[in-house]
């Protein structure tokens, strides 16, 4: 134990604490309020971005993409293509969709609803 303490004493880096005065605290509080996630995406923004993701998929005819389109029935995509689209939607909105939920997303309308109702979509 003494050897451990001696080694740690030589390895530890001194930490300087920041002395925050009232003006700095007020400034940081302002920054925090701007960074909170209170400004949720509008439905129109979600619809536009989801449709753009689907239209940009190589196997999709962009003229067939609507908010109600079904990935397999209307666009002729297979299950792997659907997984790739859901992954692209996750990337677009910086979300991680759990597998159980991702398996249910098989149309633009379901993708739009999921993203719009997710509190962390951005």
From Swiss-Prot:
It is found in: Mitochondrion. Pathway: Lipid metabolism; fatty acid biosynthesis. 4'-phosphopantetheine is transferred from CoA to a specific serine of the apo-ACP-like protein. The keyword Lipid biosynthesis applies. It holds the Pfam family PP-binding. GO terms for biological process: fatty acid biosynthetic process; mitochondrial electron transport, NADH to ubiquinone; proton transmembrane transport. One of its GO terms (cellular component) is cytosol. The modification O-(pantetheine 4'-phosphoryl)serine is found at residue 79. Its main location: mitochondrion. Residues 44-119 form the Carrier domain. Residues 1-34 form a transit peptide. InterPro entries: ACP, ACP-like_sf, PP-bd_ACP, Ppantetheine_attach_site. Keywords: Electron transport, Fatty acid biosynthesis, Fatty acid metabolism, Lipid biosynthesis, Lipid metabolism, Mitochondrion, Phosphopantetheine, Phosphoprotein, Respiratory chain, Transit peptide, Transport. Belongs to the acyl carrier protein (ACP) family. HAMAP family: Acyl_carrier (MF_01217). Complex I is composed of at least 49 different subunits. Carrier of the growing fatty acid chain in fatty acid biosynthesis. May be involved in the synthesis of short and medium chain fatty acids. Accessory and non-catalytic subunit of the mitochondrial membrane respiratory chain NADH dehydrogenase (Complex I), which functions in the transfer of electrons from NADH to the respiratory chain. This is Acyl carrier protein 1, mitochondrial. It comes from Arabidopsis thaliana (Mouse-ear cress).
């Amino acid at each position: 134990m003494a050897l451990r303490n001696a080694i740690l004493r030589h390895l530890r880096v001194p930490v300087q604490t920041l002395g925050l005065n009232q003006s700095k605290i007020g400034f940081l509080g302002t920054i925090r309020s701007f960074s909170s996630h209170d400004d949720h995406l509008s439905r129109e923004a979600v619809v536009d971005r989801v449709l753009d993701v689907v239209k940009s998929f190589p196997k999709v005819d962009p003229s067939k993409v609507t908010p109600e389109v079904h990935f397999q029935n209307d666009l002729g995509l297979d299950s792997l293509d659907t997984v790739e689209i859901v992954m692209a939607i996750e990337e677009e909105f910086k979300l991680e969709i759990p597998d159980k939920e991702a398996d249910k997303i098989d149309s633009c309308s379901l993708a739009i609803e999921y993203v719009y109702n997710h509190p962390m979509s951005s």
